[in-house]
Amino acid sequence: MSGNSRFIVSAQDGPHRDLEALVRRHMAHPFRKPIADYNREAFAAAMAAWATFGRKKPLILDAGCGVGWSPLNIAASYPDHFVIGVDQSIDRLSRGKPVELPANAVLIRADLVDFWRLLAENGIHLARHYNLYPNPWPKIGHLARRWQGHAVFPVWRELGGEVECRSNWRIYIEEMAQALSLLSGQSVVAEPYVTELPMTPFEKKYLASGHELWRCRVDLG
């Protein structure tokens, strides 16, 4: 990816005014949509891979891992953890990688909405939970499509672990920080982020294009 990425344009000039009410409503009313069979099969495959590496090893989820570069980097940084990278696109997951997938990582094609709930239903606790450069859905009317505005969002609290979300859209991270504050009861802040070692192709492209990067982090226990 070359450094020619466009800046995000939105009519929003700050966190969505309806975010708090939406998050509180979702916290009060659990998401009940039936889980698709193919996602159950994908979840079983992920659990089998974890068991092969060692079920007692701490688990890291890279939610929306795209072409799979970030799970490689995370696995290298945490060799004593098992990393599950999940993306809904088999095309993205099948693209070439700079190195082979290590023994402590697996890439899974699944819908995150179902995968998160399956983790929670099975009582699985995450050590770390990454959400790197998700689709920002910048239109004002698309709040419920952003993860912080989605009905599945409260499940994150059940999964625990150290959560980190990054984006090149400041407002997205400000919203995520606000939503995570509501979810956790902690003070979560949006902060600028700079790195010389980009974790994903998008992060590399955004840096090369002169974008500001933002992140928020919280420990959900």
Segments predicted by a language model, with ranges:
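Conserved beta-strand/loop positions that form the S-adenosyl-L-methionine
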Residues: 63, 86
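Class I SAM-dependent methyltransferase "Motif I" SAM/SAH-binding loop
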Residues: 64-68
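Conserved SAM/SAH-binding beta-strand->alpha-helix loop
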Residues: 89
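Charged helix-capping and loop-helix junction motifs
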Residues: 144-152
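S-adenosyl-L-methionine
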Residues: 1-59, 69-76, 98-123
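Class I S-adenosyl-L-methionine
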Residues: 172-179, 183-221
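Conserved beta-strand signature within the Rossmann-like core of class I S-adenosyl-L-methionine
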Residues: 159-167
